[in-house]
Amino acid sequence: MKGGMAGLMKQAQQMQEKMAKMQEELANAEVTGKAGGDMVTVVMTGRHDIKRVSIDPSLLEGVSEDDREVLEDLFAAAVNDAVRKIESNSQEKMSGMTAGMQLPPGMKLPF
């Protein structure tokens, strides 16, 4: 019985390590979303960070290249700000439910 418990603990530890590695891989993955026939493109990480926004110049006729780039950066910053606020709100609301639970570092609820 003692050996079985040790084996079970070892399996649990290995599973936790694999989960942490998978969470890191998912967090670092990048996906691209497109709209309007590829006229607007957004690149986002698994951490929900907007890395890049591209707006086709034809959508912003009369706007300089520099102003278009500023608009793209501001859009990315605004979305990132909204995502952080949602995450903070979710974490705050869930903290009451998870009080006393021992979750691995970095693990967020809901899963």
From Swiss-Prot:
Quaternary structure, from the entry: Homodimer.
Role of this protein: Binds to DNA and alters its conformation. May be involved in regulation of gene expression, nucleoid organization and DNA protection.
Highest taxon above the source species: Bacteria
Keyword entries, A-Z: Cytoplasm, DNA-binding
Organismal lineage: Bacteria, Pseudomonadati, Pseudomonadota, Gammaproteobacteria, Pseudomonadales
Region (Disordered): 1-20, 88-111
Keyword Heme: no
HAMAP family: DNA_YbaB_EbfC
One Pfam family cited in the UniProt record for this chain: YbaB_DNA_bd
Subcellular location: Cytoplasm, Nucleoid
GO molecular function: DNA binding
Protein name per its UniProtKB record: Nucleoid-associated protein PFL_1905
Family listed: Belongs to the YbaB/EbfC family.
Keyword Cytoplasm: yes
A GO CC annotation given for this chain: cytosol
